[in-house]
C-alpha cells in the first residue's frame, strides 16, 4: 500500500474510533484528499505555472482532473493570503489529536498517524517536483518550508521523539483511568511548540 492510501486508511480508522466527525457527513479521507490537492496546487502556483505534467501527476495520485483555470481558481479562493504556508491542515490537526491526546487505546498504527501524514506530504511534494521537468528553486523552497511547518507541529507535541511509541504506550497503560482534560492539557502545554495549534488541539480534546 502506498503512503497516500495508508493515510486514507488511517482517516477511516480515526473516524471509526470516534476521534472526529466532520460536519455534513464529510469523510475525513475526502477532506485529506482535498487538502493534498491544495498542497500540490500551492507548490505549482508559487511561480504561476501549471502545465500538463502537473495535471497528469494530480490525476494519477489523487484522481482529480484539474485544468489550469481550475488550479488558478483554487489558488484564488484558498491561497491568496500569506498565511497558507503556516496554516496547519485540518486533517493533520485531528491526527495530532489522536496521537498526542492518546485517543485510541492499543492504536494499530502505534500512535504514528500524524508522523506518517507529515512524511506523506514530504514524499508527495518531492515526487510532484520530480515529475515536473520545469521545477524551480522557488517551488523547492516552498515545499521545504511547508514540511518544516508540519515537523514543528509534530515536535510541539513530542511526536518526533524516537521513543514516542513506548512513551505513548506507557501513558496508556500506567493505570486504568484516563487522565482528565485538565491533566491532558497541562501535559500538552508542557511541550514546546506553536501556541495557535495547541489552542486548536486543546479545544478539540475537550469535545
Which residues are covered by each model-predicted region?
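Small-residue-enriched hydrophobic alpha-helices in membranes
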Residues: 1-185
Amino acid at each position: 500500500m502506498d503512503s497516500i492510501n495508508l493515510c486514507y486508511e488511517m482517516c477511516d480508522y480515526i473516524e471509526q474510533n470516534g476521534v472526529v466527525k466532520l460536519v455534513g457527513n464529510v469523510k475525513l479521507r475526502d477532506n485529506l484528499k482535498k487538502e493534498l490537492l491544495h498542497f500540490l496546487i500551492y507548490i505549482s502556483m508559487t511561480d504561476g505555472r501549471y502545465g500538463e505534467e502537473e495535471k497528469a501527476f494530480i490525476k494519477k495520485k489523487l484522481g482529480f482532473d484539474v485544468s489550469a483555470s481550475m488550479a488558478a481558481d483554487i489558488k484564488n479562493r484558498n491561497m491568496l493570503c500569506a498565511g497558507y504556508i503556516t496554516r496547519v491542515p485540518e486533517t493533520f490537526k485531528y491526527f495530532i489529536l489522536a496521537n498526542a491526546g492518546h485517543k485510541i487505546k492499543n492504536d494499530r498504527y502505534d500512535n504514528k498517524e500524524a508522523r506518517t501524514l507529515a512524511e506523506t506530504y514530504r514524499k508527495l511534494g518531492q515526487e510532484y517536483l520530480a515529475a515536473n521537468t520545469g521545477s524551480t528553486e522557488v517551488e523547492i523552497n516552498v515545499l521545504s518550508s511547508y514540511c518544516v511547518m508540519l515537523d514543528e507541529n509534530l515536535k510541539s507535541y513530542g511526536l518526533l521523539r524516537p521513543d514516542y511509541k513506548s512513551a505513548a504506550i506507557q501513558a496508556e497503560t500506567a493505570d486504568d483511568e484516563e487522565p482528565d482534560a485538565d491533566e491532558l492539557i497541562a501535559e500538552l502545554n508542557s511541550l514546546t511548540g506553536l501556541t495557535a495549534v495547541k489552542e486548536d488541539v486543546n479545544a478539540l480534546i475537550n469535545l
